[in-house]
């Protein structure tokens, strides 16, 4: 799954990645560290905090539109 991330360059590829991620959870649940949505979301937040101060950080955080990310996550709740 992680190897697919670098090739995502369009909305369609992102949607396909989300669908693949959902399928991976269904098919390989035992490989997932986080088994609940709350654990999953908490660990995303934790990873962002840790990685943003890591020497390995290669993300340009100021270029990310966090409002859109928040909207995507919220719409998954209510749509």
Residue ranges and their predicted role:
Residues 14, 21, 40, 44-47, ...:
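Amphipathic alpha-helices that form helix-helix packing interfaces
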Residues 54-79:
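Short, compact, well-ordered microdomains
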Residues 30-63:
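Amphipathic protein-protein interaction modules
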Residues 20, 24-27, 46-54, 72-75:
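Amphipathic alpha-helical interaction surfaces
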Residues 2-30:
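N-terminal acidic leader/helix
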Residues 4-7, 52, 79:
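Intrinsically disordered, low-complexity Ser/Thr/Pro-rich tracts
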């Amino acid at each position: 799954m992680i190897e697919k991330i670098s090739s995502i360059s369009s909305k369609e590829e992102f949607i396909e990645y989300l669908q693949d991620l959902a399928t991976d959870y269904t098919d390989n649940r035992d490989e997932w560290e986080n088994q609940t949505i709350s654990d999953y979301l908490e660990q995303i937040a934790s990873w962002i905090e840790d990685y943003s101060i890591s020497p390995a950080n290669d993300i340009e955080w100021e270029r990310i539109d966090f409002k859109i990310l928040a909207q995507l996550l919220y719409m998954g709740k209510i749509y």
